[in-house]
Amino acid sequence: GGQGTSLHLSGELLNHLHKIELVHVPYRGAAPAIVALVANEIQLLFDNSMSAIGHLRGGRGKALGIAARARLPAIADVPTLDESGSPGFEASIAHAVMVVNAVPKPTVAVLNRAVNAAVNDAEYKAAVTEFGVTLIGGTPEHLMKFLASERAKFADIIRKRNVKVN
């Protein structure tokens, strides 16, 4: 990923945890980064499952580990980075539905129920799981707690690794 993206920060987290110095090479998206990996211009890539899984299944790359808490059913033979010797390594990409603060709480509750219904729909869940996506529903409070935790973890990495954004 580009400078300061979640994928870049994943690499910096690995650098920090293992006291190594991987060189970050910024790309404008996953496609050119994967082309560089396949062409052996780079030797390592952090990518999200949605863009990587087709290339992995096609034999154009090898997954060394999943940066999530648990293995992904779509590529269950790939261990987590925690299992591979990076204890506690977790750097997943999260997507959330958010609204401005002015939206009334009853409206937020209706939206939250609708999103959770979609997340828990068996057909939808099966379709996205095939691409390595793990769906997690919850409450707005749960989301805010998660975001605060991620912000704290990566703010620390940004400071310690002196990450700059262009």
Predicted features and spans:
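Conserved, function-defining micro-sites of small-solute handling proteins
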Residues: 1-166
